[in-house]
Amino acid sequence: MKNLLFACLISAAISCNTSDEKKIPAMEGTYFMNMQTLNDGKKDTKYTDLKQLKMYTGQFFMYTQVNPKDSVSAFGVGSYTANNDSGTVTESVIYSASDSSFRDDPAQYVLNITITSDGYQQVIPEIVMDSSNYKLTEDYKRSGDSTKTPLDGVWKETHSVVINGNDTTVNQRVQYKAYYGGYFMFGQYVKDSSSKSRTGIGFGTFKMISNNEIEETDLNSTYAIIAGHSFKVKIQMDGPDKYSQTILNGDGTTGIENYERLKK
């Protein structure tokens, strides 16, 4: 099922019928997924236990997901355009990962959107999984607030290290991070100490304490050690499109991460 759910997230390439009345307003915002519904032509199967957050920020989007039953995680990132006349959103994915697999070749998908009173609904009428056809419906609820910060947007990590006493280790990973409406998320694809590849994510709320410090509260994560906890993070902006962050980890190590803003 974990592979099925990931396929649902990144394979939204099939259109559904939309009437002339379906218009797409600005999609910028933060959304929690409430439910996925799969229909095999005979019955609906509903999934309400997945924890997923999605952000549309300016011209870019990002989503992160974790299954609390087994901590299997997924994320994706890319650019998007809202097509008012057709009632669709076109997403151009530049990177996605799930569990032990990743995809870094560009892919474009057209999503048909129905705006609801508190968010939106996405319907994919036909998607192939395990050689069978399904209809997929996803329901999202808007969250977040009107808070604006210099961090708002989607960022790619360019370099990061962990410092332990006199030892410095360079992280071998791909990591993205996003901020919007008082929420943050990160997604990473890493090799662990046994050289096994895995996907990790986290998302929650954040607030600016000062120009050089934020507080992040992780609501859901692949990593139990950070889920439900708050962390003070030192930040240093280098113009509007670069920043670095420094955090003292619970094990006494220090993590330093450098980011660049995604731009078209």
Range-by-range predicted roles:
Residues 82-84, 237:
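Short, low-complexity Ser/Thr-rich regulatory SLiMs
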Residues 84-88, 210-214:
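Short, conserved beta-turn/loop elements at beta-strand boundaries and strand-helix junctions
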